[in-house]
Amino acid sequence: MSYPQEVNKRRTFAIISHPDAGKTTITEKVLLYGNAIQTAGSVKGKGSSAHAKSDWMEMEKQRGISITTSVMQFPYNNCLVNLLDTPGHEDFSEDTYRTLTAVDSCLMVIDSAKGVEERTIKLMEVTRLRDTPILTFMNKLDRDIRDPMELLDEVESVLKIRCAPITWPIGCGKLFKGVYHIAKDETYLYQSGQGSTIQEVRIVKGLSSPELDAAVGDDLANQLREELELVQGASNEFDHEAFINGELTPVFFGTALGNFGVDHFLDGLTEWAPKPQARQTDVRTVESSEEKFSGFVFKIQANMDPKHRDRVAFMRVVSGKYEKGMKLKHVRIGKDVVISDALTFMAGDRAHAEEAYAGDIIGLHNHGTIQIGDTFTQGEVMKFTGIPNFAPELFRRIRLKDPLKQKQLLKGLVQLSEEGAVQVFRPLMNNDLIVGAVGVLQFDVVVSRLKTEYNVEAIYEAVNVATARWVECGDAKKFEEFKRKNEQNLALDGGDNLTYIAPTMVNLNLAQERYPDINFFKTREH
């Protein structure tokens, strides 16, 4: 197959949802339909307890939530689909944001009993930054749901995106009978499939067919016809250009748990979602059709293989083809490296990649030299932009139970901060170690991983820090004066960047007023 054909058949997407909307179930069912796993919801390990394929960290196993982002590749409809799993728990980290910089489209999963929830709103704001095309799956039709028309209205008004229903539900809960495909004029009748059973779906042609009345009952058939008249009058038709621009979302109804409707949105994804897209660098735009290799690191994850103390850097291939043993330029450090053992992912199963194309995600073994945001090329000096680092909103001082392990603690914290799991600050005036996070759960993750991966027992204490900003200044003399007068508020982060840590927002505002020549940054490019 030629290079353009390989690139054109790739689709790279992430699933976004509020916790408990059914994202983990959908992820499994997508893999099931892609024949990538045999039993949904399980990797039967030696302990024979089932763990979802994409949840591999110890704490995730205990809590049943997907904290880290994994990558899964599977074939579907003559396409190769890369699914990036994003954390679905109550408070998520920058990992989620950064993962969304590595995809070309997203599937938004909504719990049809609840409608649009707060996390979904937050994630949609992130996809807006790059006008990412969005498909929508209204989940849990096997339960009692809100009025479907009301759900569409809510998505339109709250998320500011037009809805184009592709399928329409017939009943819900115990009365759920299936969905009607508007463009194809076909009804797909619901039979619950459990676990890894995908039922053969019975299809009824035509909305006026007596077979439809016989299958779902006169009342529901008539209700469907009435609702469709309303829908066709009140909602939008699917418009591919508006979808690609992130202005309109095709909407599918189904139940992931009942293995129903998942294939409809997969068909939509492979048919409509964009092939790998161009990306901006600080020098020029790189097109996916270019044959020279380039890519950027959007995530670093430690210890994916408990048997090996390794760290893997996840790289999105932007252009060209990766081949085993190829020489690439690691732009930030200006060094050429030979990559002979990159990984491809089927969650939990890591295979060595012989080749990878634009749109694919590969894993590079990292011994501390690779950072989030790093660019790799075949020689060209450029840096991909738009991979953010956010100023944390929560801070704690971290302290050792055994003071002799200070070295391991620092090593662990710096590695976890390079991974983006948390940020670490070392104040200039003392030997404290302050941990900053975007969400509370990150603190638990850090303590649990320090214990299991670095054999360090640590505890947190309250610390008088309300917020942090990265500081820079073009005038060296003024910067020195600022540093001299504010030493008690300055710290170095994990990458040795100077940071202003403020005990209150008032303190920060005063500092910004007092030093107009100093730039205080809330986000920083990696």
UniProtKB/Swiss-Prot annotation:
Which domain of life, per UniProt? Bacteria
- Claim: Magnesium is one of the keywords in the record: no
Q: What is its main location?
A: cytoplasm
Q: What Pfam family is a match, any one?
A: RF3_C
**Compartments it resides in:** Cytoplasm
Q: State the InterPro entries in the record.
A: EF-G-like_DII (IPR053905), EFG_III/V (IPR035647), G_TR_CS (IPR031157), P-loop_NTPase (IPR027417), PrfC (IPR004548), RF3_C (IPR032090), RF3_dom_3_sf (IPR038467), RF3_GTP-bd (IPR041732)
Tell me yes or no: is Ribosomal protein among this UniProt entry's keywords: no
- The tr-type G domain is annotated at 8-277
An example Gene Ontology molecular-function term = GTPase activity
Q: In Gene Ontology terms, what is a biological process of this protein?
A: regulation of translational termination
Keywords (A to Z) from UniProt: Cytoplasm, GTP-binding, Nucleotide-binding, Protein biosynthesis
Tell me which positions the record assigns to the signal sequence.
none
Stated role: Increases the formation of ribosomal termination complexes and stimulates activities of RF-1 and RF-2. It binds guanine nucleotides and has strong preference for UGA stop codons. It may interact directly with the ribosome. The stimulation of RF-1 and RF-2 is significantly reduced by GTP and GDP, but not by GMP.
What protein family does this chain belong to?
Belongs to the TRAFAC class translation factor GTPase superfamily. Classic translation factor GTPase family. PrfC subfamily.
The name this protein carries in UniProt is Peptide chain release factor 3
Please give the organism.
Answer: Actinobacillus pleuropneumoniae serotype 3 (strain JL03)
Instruction: Report the gene name.
Output: prfC
